[in-house]
Amino acid sequence: MSGELNGNDTSAQAAVSAGSVLEGAAFADEGEQHNESMKTLVLGALGVVYGDIGTSPIYAFREALHAAATNGILARSDILGVVSLIFWALTLVVTVKYVLFVLRADNNGEGGILSLMALVRGALKGRPDLILGVGICGAALFFGDAVITPAISVLSAMEGLEIVAPNLTPFVVPATVVILVTLFSVQKLGTGRVAIVFGPIMALWFVALGASGLWHIFDDPTVMAALNPYYAVRFLTVSPAVAFVTVGAVFLAMTGAEALYADLGHFGRKPIVRAWLWIVFPCLLLNYFGQAAFILSHGEAAALPFFQMIPSFALWPMVLLATAATVIASQAVITGAYSVARQAVQLNILSRLEIQHTSEKLHGQIYIPRVNLLLGLAVVILVLGFEKSSNLAAAYGIAVTGNMLVTTVLLYIVMTRIWNWRVSRALPIILGFLVIDMLFFSANIIKVHEGGWASIGIATVLVLIMWTWVRGTRHLFQKTRKAEVPLDLIVEQMAKRPPTIVPGTAVFLTGDPKSAPTALMHSLKHYKVLHENNVILTVVTASKPWVASADRARVSQYNERFMLVTLTFGYMQQPNIPRALGLCRRLGWKFDIMTTSFFLSRRSLKASVHSGMPLWQDKLFILLARTASDATEYFQIPTGRVVEIGTQVNI
């Protein structure tokens, strides 16, 4: 009944909405229609993929300068060193690592940490639990990032009020909370109608970034000398202790880079790469170098350089545009959180969650109430607790650097096991990435006491929850399997002592088709009847994102009364059992929903001292199982056709 652990349902449901567009644009390289599709996808990528990294200039350069200052004093070499570090970090991590390598490690067109985990688990058969653990850690860190991004992004934009109208400073936090509460409150309405403007707004944002930066580069054109890596190396070597702390702040310029890979299934590789190389990367560099030039010529203006370099007549529009951009960035992260949560459910590393579709036309538009509530509460608590974006900066880096580190480790396995690269070719590249990732991770991990504990705490709790669910479902499967009777034996006994036969079809959901389903055993025990046709149904999640309808169902006739059916879904597909069973007509079984009853087992779990898990983990697993979404709704079975049979199990 549940998807197998070596299957996958990762990726983003938000990706589904763009999937059909992607297919038409990803293969042809000529023709006017393709060009228009590519432009549309590039514009869409600006609104979804680059919202997070695109709003980093608001606070990243400021935080790096604060870290680099000695006794509050910044030398020219410090400013050039910081902007040089940002340039080379964006070049090496985003342009080289993600654009040239990670984006090529797709799982049938899909990306994201869980999709990468699925790809690697399929190639590395020997240690599935190790890869599963790495994937769980990556997913947990993603959720840690998803909590911090809306908080720091919107808060940093609202801090522009301190420049526009200093008397409004006390309202920065309340205004941020109001915006975030509103954002999370409207999620259930869907974002389809407003999402169409995300791309144009972010395009305007990047133009504003580039234009404001280019204007101020002329304040001190010598700032362009920082393109030379000499300034970055000199900054790192002259004062290593200060530089080490600064590196942690420099990383803020790259937060959101993982979205390039996570949203691969939304738009495809080409639009994401082109948006980065043509628009995002140039505009980010212009803005960072513009901020550096502005500070070099206005030494006293290092407090909020992003807003301070904006002309007074444009301040209010820029604050409003920044707020819109950060809300869009937050929306992209929220959508991504829904997607990863759904993937985790399909991979059976999270309990079933209620998933609501907010669009009849676009299946990728989903809303998960529980994720929305918990995420919204966590974001608001962070804003109220930290109050300033500077205080949140320390918490931000740990989650993202950890996620990038996990990606690098899995990328090595992809290179050697899937791309069949020689170790001598893959290892130098991966070691280079690991050195950079470890430098950033270690520079951020020392900030645990400054706020890093928040992201570590969130990730740790989520790892415990996911691992408890994985471990608990395994123990439950082993426990129930011991008590189950082989299906062969039951069929043989019924052949000798046939029960009363009643008309209709009974479908019994089970995770093990070789054993008699619990619901079947209880039906025979209490009702003493057997339907004319009995289907032993198993639902499996494949290790690829999509499974074609032609490959959805496998049917084998057991005997005249019993049939074995296996339904396979991709990890990007929402299981719909009645619709999938309808496909069995071409295989010789005429499925009729009006004459079919679905028998499900509802287990009542009790903690046991002999479960093999600590008592606290038993209780946590039982809580997760009790609060899981109803199987009837999850598999989209009509409630009027369902018979639930309860059993009690000591785990």
Swiss-Prot record:
Q: Where are the transmembrane segments?
A: 41-61, 82-102, 130-150, 163-183, 194-214, 235-255, 276-296, 309-329, 366-386, 395-415, 426-446, 450-470
Q: Which UniProt keywords apply?
A: Cell inner membrane, Cell membrane, Ion transport, Membrane, Potassium, Potassium transport, Symport, Transmembrane, Transmembrane helix, Transport
An example Pfam family from this entry, by short name, is K_trans
User: Chief subcellular site?
Assistant: membrane
Instruction: Report one GO cellular component.
Output: plasma membrane
Q: How does it sit in the membrane?
A: Multi-pass membrane protein
Q: Where in the cell is it found?
A: Cell inner membrane
Molecular-function GO term, any one: potassium ion transmembrane transporter activity
InterPro entries named in the record = K+_transporter, K_trans_C, K_trans_N, Kup
Task: Spell out the reaction equation it catalyses.
Answer: K(+)(in) + H(+)(in) = K(+)(out) + H(+)(out)
Function (record text): Transport of potassium into the cell. Likely operates as a K(+):H(+) symporter.
Which family, according to the similarity comment?
A: Belongs to the HAK/KUP transporter (TC 2.A.72) family.
Q: Which named protein is this?
A: Probable potassium transport system protein Kup
